[in-house]
Structures are given as structure tokens and as C-alpha cells.
């Protein structure tokens, strides 16, 4: 893995690919994932590029594979994983693969079409059989037909008129029979009555079982109906109404003999159709099983082939159209691998003239490549979310690995909560190879991707929880308190000592609401707690006052150290980019401004802690007053922290005042002087011009020494401000904005770090309230039923702890930690104006199809 401190050194390379070997060379490059292609045909439409026909062929193959996957999934056939990453298919096998897939598609569509046709015929025959069975007794029955709706007039006692009677009336009696869905029966009957004006008689009955609709495949409830009518015009109306309501009409036999013959024929045909349908389904499943063996590999191969042609469309042809020219960004350490990939592709294609590459100088800014692993990837993503780092500048992710979980833990510090978070993250880490976790839903996937961040956040929270001595809002007495309560009783001291000190007696114990421990009394304070805060503070009424003072000062100290470290990292950027004047004219004034004010504030805090004990604490001056007096220069003499304090503060204020104009005007004036002189600091040595060679002939004229020199100076050329681009007004305005932003930002950013204190206080108080409202109530029950009450109380306490204190409070602390890194820390040195290096790599392809077919 490359360095995480700074991005990889990149170079621009020109590839010369023979037409017959270009496909194989790009296939080898895609497997290695070493280079990022530049589009040399930006002014050419995607429909006018050289290999658009091949891309269309790949899209057609993708369409066929999508159809195959859909049919295999519909048949509930498992898709075997097969080879994880098969190579791109050779060109000589592409046409064969296309013919096989097209032939398989035609066969599947034909078999599927025949199967659906057989299935539809079978369902129609089954419906016809049910219709004959139900309507068999309609003409033999003589029951009273009761209308469903009041607007229907009552019928005669006989539901159907006698056929002989109709013959005597001279009318022609007709029948229409079929099936209709249950939900359409009432509307269907109403429409028949209104349209036919009562010249129809409808008889219907519900089927005992649900049948599948041949059109939709939905299993629904059906009704069998028989419509008797007289007159040809009425018959036409009835048939049209049946079509409107999507009724399934079947011929109605006129005689019992005809009914019996139809029934026998239907039974025979149904048995034959069952046999043919089963054989068709077996054959279709065999074809799909055979296709499923290679469909996953085919998907990957087609995606790789399409990606290769996308990259070939970015290349340009030379004047002879026999050679493709490509420009790629490649890390310098991967140049040998790039050459080997070209040799491998040329060897596989059997070309007599191998493909080759040359590095070319450029003034363009290369993309940023920072190699990560599964541990550092999450922290790098946090930095990249703010902005991808500029080329070769210091990468904050290296330090974020420690500072981010630590600042989170300062706000979240609780031993119990941190340990629960650590266990959850440890569970994700130990099961990181589980396929269900890596393919889970979005929220769980987000936790899984940040498992190492959660692990360190939980681990650091355990550490800060031990310092705060907080475990679910309660203190843990591991080493014994450093305070001795018994030493405060008067009985433990001599009468002479009792006259000099305020001690406790029985009356004091009975009548005082609060008792104060005096560390000046011998034996009361035996020394500091070995690690963290003494557990006796958990019982003190002034506990919150003490913790607020401690956490506020700690937040200021951590914030100033964090920001100063960011300014120091900026020095590494200036030295790397050969801009030493920025060190003296920008970084040094910034450090002086920061340390002379806020560094001195840290000094006063630590000095007061060390110089004043419990005996002299009443004489200790206020740091706030002393810090304000530092800028007011009071005439009256005050008792300072140390001798000579006023002189030291005057010197620090003078340095601060002098640093501001240097920061404001130093860099613009120096660049103006440099622009007018042109002979200072080696400008004559750097005044060369980097020219890109646009053809193979020009590249061949370059000597190896020139190419090496161009590569080594590419970084300087990318950032060099030429004489033609110099604009003093713009530089002055930019530096003025930077100076004002920095000076005001030092104050606002220092105040912003007080969120460490605020969120730590909020988390501790919320945890304390949750304990007091739930666990304290459950633990105070002394009856026999106390255990039974404690179980639901503990369960409710655990649920609220997880969702409120771990999830909600953890998310809040997480966002505030991100803010402190993005704004307060990274703006001191991090530009974040680069572009990410996205290599042409087959590992970035997915085996699943999506609407976006381009290579990410």
C-alpha cells in the first residue's frame, strides 16, 4: 500500500496500440486497474465514434442476458456463482458467443410461447368443463328466480320458458353460456336487463373452486352464467355485452347427447394437454438450467467487453489509421506494471509489432490517488466527503484515524456506552466476510462500511469514560478514593488543631444539609486518584461545577493543539511544493498569532494548575481576568500569576500585532518583487516550457533524459505562477481574505471547540436523568416483587440507552466531530480541490445490470 500521508506521484503516459492488439491490451489493463484514460475525442459525439457498432452489439448481448436472467429467476432456478471474474472474451470468440446467445433466446422465446399457448388452452378447456357441469341442470330445474335488484320485475314461477311454448309463439330461442368474474356479476346482470329490456333470462351459479384467468394468470373466483333470449337482435346485444365485461363465452350444447360427446372430448384433450405441457415445462427447465450454468460468467464478460470498447472510443487514431493513441494517468510506481500489461496484450494477440508507451510532460494537474485498505477506507471517505485532496498535498486521513474517534470520545465519554459500541463494532469486524452483511440494506450497509470507525470510537469512548469515571452515569471506585471523610471529625484531632480548623461534630452532622471536605485539613486529602476523576465527586453537590471547569479547559487545550497541528502540516505542503516563502510569510505569522494569544492561554491554565495548591487556591487570580488584562494594559498593578507577567504579555501582544501585517502584505509584496526581478530564488532555472508531443515521431525524438526531467518537474510546473498570469490585485485580495479569515477564525474556531464540553455535559446529564427515572426506581423496590419489576425496567432502560444515548447522541457527537475536522482543522492546510483517480478496472464493474452502463 502506498503512503497515506501524501497522494501517489502520477505521470501522464501516451500509449501506442496497434489496431489488432488494442482490445487485448486494454483487457490486460482492465484486469490490473493501473491507469485512468483521458478522453481524446471530447468534441466527437458518442454516436460518431469508431467503436459505436461494437458498443451496440454489447448492449444487444446485455439485453439477451437480461431476458435469460429474468426467465431463470421466474423458473426458481438458482444462479450459480461460477468464476468470480472471468477474463474478457477473445475477439475470435465474440461472434460465436453472440450466435449462441441469439439462438438460445429464439429457442427460449419459442418454447415459452408454446408453453403459454398450451397453458391458455388448458385453462379454457377446464373452464369449459366446469361450465358444462354447472349448466347441466339449468334447463331441468324449475325453481323460482328471485331478482337481486328492486328495479327488476318479478319473473314467472318457471325460470325458463318451456321450449314448446316458445315454438307456439313463433320466436327463436337462443342460449349464451360462459364464465364471468365475481366482481362483475351485479353490473353485468343490470346491463343485460336495461339493454335487452327484459327479453333475456339470466341464470348463474358460483363455482366451488377458484380458477386462474388465462389472460392475466390471476387466481380469482368465477361465476357460471346461462342467458336465454329470443330474437337474433337480442342475441347480438347479449354477445356484445359479454365482450364488454370480458366474459369467457363457450358453446352451449342443444341436446344431452351433444353435451355428453363434448364432455368426453374435453376430458381426452385435457389429459393430452397435461402430458404435452409437462413435457414442455421439463424441456424448458432443462434449457434454463443449462443457460444458468454460464449466464453469470457471460454477464461479467459482456460488461468487460463493453467497458473495453468505451475506453477505445476515448482513443484517437494516427494519420495511417493503423495505430490507436491513448493518454492515461498512471502512478509512477505502476509504470513497470503498465509496460508488462502492454507486452502481455501484444503477446496474446500474436502481433508482430508490440504496443508501447512513453511518458510525456504536462502542466495539467494530475488526479489524486491515495491507496487505502479496509481499515483506512472509512476515514478516507470522511475526508473525501469534504473534498478530494489536491495533487500531492498532505492527506488529513492519516491523522483523522486517531483524532476523529478521540474527539468523538471526548463528547461521548462513557465507559458503559463506549463498551457497548465497541462490542457492536467488534461483531461487525469479526463477521465482515459474511455475504449477508456486505449485501444488506442501506442503513445496515452504512454501519458495516464504517465498522472500523465505530470500533475506534467505542474504544476511545471507553478510555475517556475511564478518565471521566462515568459508567452509565455512575462512578466506579476501582482504586479507592483519595479523600478521607473520617479525618473531618473533631475527635480525630487535638484540641489545638480543632481551634484552627473547621471540623465536624455530631451537631454539624445532624443540622447541616451539606458537608464540605477541606483538603487543607491533614488526612482529608491523601493524593490524587490514580487514573481519572475521583469517584467521590459523584456524591458532591458541586460536581457539575467542577466537571464544567475541567471539561471547558480541556476543550480549549485540545482545540488549540488541534488547530496548531493543522498549521504545522501546512508547512509540509509549502516545502513539498517548493514555496519556502510561504513558510516565512504565511505559516510563521500564523503560528505566532496562534501561540502568542491562545498558546499563552494554555500556558496560564497549566501554570495555574501546577503553581497553586489547595492551601493557596484562594490567592490564585482569575485566568479570564488576566487574559482580558493582557490586551487592556491596565495601569493599576494586579497580583499576576508569576513575576514579570506584564512584560511577557506586552511582548506577546507586540508579536501578535506584528504578525498580522506580515500575514496580510508579506506574500503579495514578495511575489510582486519576484515578478519584477525574475532572477531571484532560481527563477531562471525553472523558466523552461513543458510541451506535449502530439505524435509518435515527436515522442521518439525526445531523449530519455528530457523525459525524466519532465516527470520530475511536473509537480512544480502544475503549480508555477507564470509571469503572464501574475495579477497583483488578485493576489492581494486573496491574501487579505485569507488573513482576515484566519485571524477571526482562530477566535471563532477556538470557541467552536467548546462543543466538546457542551456535548459531553449533555450526554452525561441525559444519562444521569435516564438512570434516575428508571433504574433508581427499579432498584429501590425492596418487596418480593422487586425482581419481577426490575426485569421490565432493565429492558426499557436498555432500549432507551441504545436508541437515545447510543444512536441519537452518538450520531450527534459523530456529526460534531466531522465538523471540527472539516472546518476547524482542515481549513488550516487542506485545499481539497483535486479530482479523484478513477482507474479503468474491471473490479469496479458489477455483475448486475443497471440503467447506467458507463464505467465509473
Swiss-Prot record:
Tissues in which the protein is found: Relatively high expression in kidney and liver. Lower levels in the spleen, testis, and skeletal muscle. Also expressed in the thymus.
A biological-process GO annotation: cellular response to increased oxygen levels
Keywords: Cell membrane, Endosome, Hydrogen ion transport, Ion transport, Membrane, Phosphoprotein, Transmembrane, Transmembrane helix, Transport
Principal localisation: membrane
Side Cytoplasmic, residues: 1-393, 432-445, 570-587, 672-739, 825-856
Bilayer disposition of the protein: Multi-pass membrane protein
GO molecular function: proton-transporting ATPase activity, rotational mechanism
Residues passing through the membrane, by range: 394-412, 415-431, 446-475, 550-569, 588-608, 652-671, 740-764, 786-824
Compartment(s) where it occurs, according to its Swiss-Prot or TrEMBL record: Cell membrane; Endosome membrane
Residues bearing PTM Phosphoserine: 695, 700
InterPro entries to which the protein is assigned, alphabetical: V-ATPase_116kDa_su, V-type_ATPase_116kDa_su_euka
Disulfide bonds: none
KW Cell membrane (keyword) present: yes
Superkingdom of origin organism: Eukaryota
PANTHER family named among the record's database cross-references: V-TYPE PROTON ATPASE 116 KDA SUBUNIT A 2, VACUOLAR PROTON ATPASES
Similarity comment: Belongs to the V-ATPase 116 kDa subunit family.
Function: Subunit of the V0 complex of vacuolar(H+)-ATPase (V-ATPase), a multisubunit enzyme composed of a peripheral complex (V1) that hydrolyzes ATP and a membrane integral complex (V0) that translocates protons. V-ATPase is responsible for acidifying and maintaining the pH of intracellular compartments and in some cell types, is targeted to the plasma membrane, where it is responsible for acidifying the extracellular environment. Essential component of the endosomal pH-sensing machinery.
Protein name: V-type proton ATPase 116 kDa subunit a 2
Organism, scientific name: Mus musculus (Mouse)
